[in-house]
């Protein structure tokens, strides 16, 4: 078990790093001046006025590729969490993980590239035509991208179910750090702010667009801390 904990601890750290790199890509998209007319993924004033920096898409791509490569360690850690006798649950996590690693990076780059095209085309074609063109392209391609979201849901919900039903070696209280909990909290903060009458801010877009990767990073770091404490307790014994 000690050797498994060392591997698990390392995998969780690498997984957290991978999620952090993916989050950098989310920041490339969301850390821009907010306008009260901003909405959705691409109807952002900073995109439409051509001020979105040319360096952002290459950075999003580079960090995304590295982050998805490190996603291998995330999936292996989630697989290792589940006790060996629960083979079907392990298989579900593995299948969802393979789909996630193979396809989530494509979605990441698709969103980034459409933001970049919005930035490039708006000064040439005008706002209304650019918005219509980009939205049509997004609606045309996203149905094909649903396979990525299917993989993500299988991993996230399957892992949450395994933790709650004690199919993992983790204590049940660890669910408070789970991706489901963190992501829901991050997503509802902008909604709560707007319900209270606050103006739209850059932070609203950061929290909503980066919630998934931030939540994964929190979950991986929480698991790394737990595994490290277990190792220390084993050394004391």
Summary of predicted features, one role per range:
Residues 2-236:
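Hydrophobic, aromatic-enriched alpha-helical segments typical of multi-pass transmembrane helices
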């Amino acid at each position: 078990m000690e050797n498994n904990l060392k591997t698990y601890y390392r995998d969780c750290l690498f997984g957290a790093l991978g999620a952090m790199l993916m989050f950098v890509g989310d920041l490339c998209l969301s850390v821009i001046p907010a306008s009260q007319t901003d909405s959705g993924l691409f109807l952002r004033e900073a995109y439409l006025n051509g001020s979105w920096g040319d360096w952002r898409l290459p950075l999003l791509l580079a960090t995304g590729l590295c982050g998805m490569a490190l996603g291998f360690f995330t999936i292996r850690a989630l697989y290792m969490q589940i006790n060996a006798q629960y083979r079907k649950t392990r298989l579900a996590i593995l299948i969802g993980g393979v789909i996630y690693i193979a396809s989530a990076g494509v979605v990441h780059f698709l969103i980034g590239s459409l933001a970049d095209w919005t930035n490039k085309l708006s000064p040439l074609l005008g706002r209304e035509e650019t918005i219509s063109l980009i939205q049509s392209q997004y609606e045309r391609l996203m149905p094909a991208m649903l396979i990525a979201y299917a993989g993500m849901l299988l991993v996230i919900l399957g892992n949450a179910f395994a933790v709650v039903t004690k199919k993992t070696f983790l204590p049940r209280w660890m669910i408070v750090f789970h991706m489901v909990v963190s992501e829901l909290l991050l997503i509802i903060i902008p909604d709560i702010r707007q319900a209270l009458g606050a103006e739209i801010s850059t932070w609203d877009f950061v929290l909503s667009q980066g919630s998934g990767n931030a939540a994964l990073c929190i979950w991986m770091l929480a698991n790394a801390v737990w595994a490290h404490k277990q190792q220390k307790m084993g050394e004391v014994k």
